[in-house]
Amino acid sequence: IVQSILRLWTSFLKVFNPDPEKAAKKGAKEEGLLSDLSALDKKTVLQIVDSAFVFSCCWSLCVTVNTQFRRPFDLFFRKVCNGEIDGILKFNNRKILPEALNKGTIYDYVFFPDKNEWKPWLSLVDKDSIDKFAKDAVVQDIVVTTIDTIRYSYIQEHCINNEIPTLFVGPTGTGKSVYINNVLLNTLPKEKFNII
């Protein structure tokens, strides 16, 4: 779990560091999204680092609990992040949980490090393309847009693009294979990825 947290966290912190391999392929200096750190104040940098850490914990450590225990775990995780539990390391006397997460649970939001912004998962939905199926679509291959399909597709795509191994677990018949196939076949750029 620790390795998963660190892999995700590192992938989100790439906004501070341009990828030299991509730059070499392009033949020019690639700018990281936030590569000019001198333009950012220390508080903003800390907010991005903290938020990336919280999001990484949420989607590696916190997702190990099943749906019925997410709310209690959310409350516990908030107390840890806010330094409200004695005996647990405090984060230099500062709260690392952003104000944006005051409504709902930590599972309800996605973090965009390049904008230092938290948004509800549902804001990622393209309302024009919701549940438009091909006439010849096979029932078992249809992906109905839900908050879970949005979350899992985003996380899977992010992990694939950052070469982070993933494992989707859960009860039989909950759509794991369909989510994975949907991302592999319909979301990833065809010029970069081939399905074998």
Q: Which ranges hold each PLM region?
A:
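AAA+ P-loop NTPase catalytic core
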Residues: 1-196
